[in-house]
């Protein structure tokens, strides 16, 4: 089995990133916004892996680990904010967050 060509891997990463960006802009539910952010971060991680494999450098794998670590931190903080938003307003609508003042 051969390696995936650079163009194909970057095209898939670009499509995933665009899908995540569209989901980020269109959705009003904070859970879907978080999922769209995860898709975007995984697309960038895929681009790093594909580029690292193309030039036979371990830098892509190192950046992949960094991106996955950042995605885990973002998910945990985002879910904590989601829970607090739901407890306070009983909705997951992101526009309700504009009412939070403190």
Swiss-Prot record:
Family according to the record: Belongs to the complex I subunit 4L family.
> How the protein assembles, per its UniProt entry?
NDH-1 is composed of 13 different subunits. Subunits NuoA, H, J, K, L, M, N constitute the membrane sector of the complex.
Location in or out of the cell: Cell inner membrane
Output the InterPro entries linked to this UniProt entry.
NADH_UbQ_OxRdtase_chain4L/K, NUOK/Mnh_C1-like
Q: Which Gene3D superfamilies match?
A: 1.10.287.3510
| Catalyzed reactions per annotation | a quinone + NADH + 5 H(+)(in) = a quinol + NAD(+) + 4 H(+)(out)
GO CC list: NADH dehydrogenase complex; plasma membrane
Query: What GO molecular functions are on record for this protein?
Result: NADH:ubiquinone reductase (non-electrogenic) activity; quinone binding
Keyword Magnesium annotated: no
The protein's name is: NADH-quinone oxidoreductase subunit K
Q: Name one GO biological process term.
A: ATP synthesis coupled electron transport
Amino-acid biosynthesis in keyword set: no
Q: What is its EC number?
A: 7.1.1.-
Q: What is its main location?
A: membrane
Keywords, sorted A to Z? Cell inner membrane, Cell membrane, Membrane, NAD, Quinone, Translocase, Transmembrane, Transmembrane helix, Transport, Ubiquinone
What Pfam families does the entry give?
Oxidored_q2
Q: How does it sit in the membrane?
A: Multi-pass membrane protein
Transmembrane annotation, as ranges = 6-26, 30-50, 62-82
Free-text function comment from the UniProt entry: NDH-1 shuttles electrons from NADH, via FMN and iron-sulfur (Fe-S) centers, to quinones in the respiratory chain. The immediate electron acceptor for the enzyme in this species is believed to be ubiquinone. Couples the redox reaction to proton translocation (for every two electrons transferred, four hydrogen ions are translocated across the cytoplasmic membrane), and thus conserves the redox energy in a proton gradient.
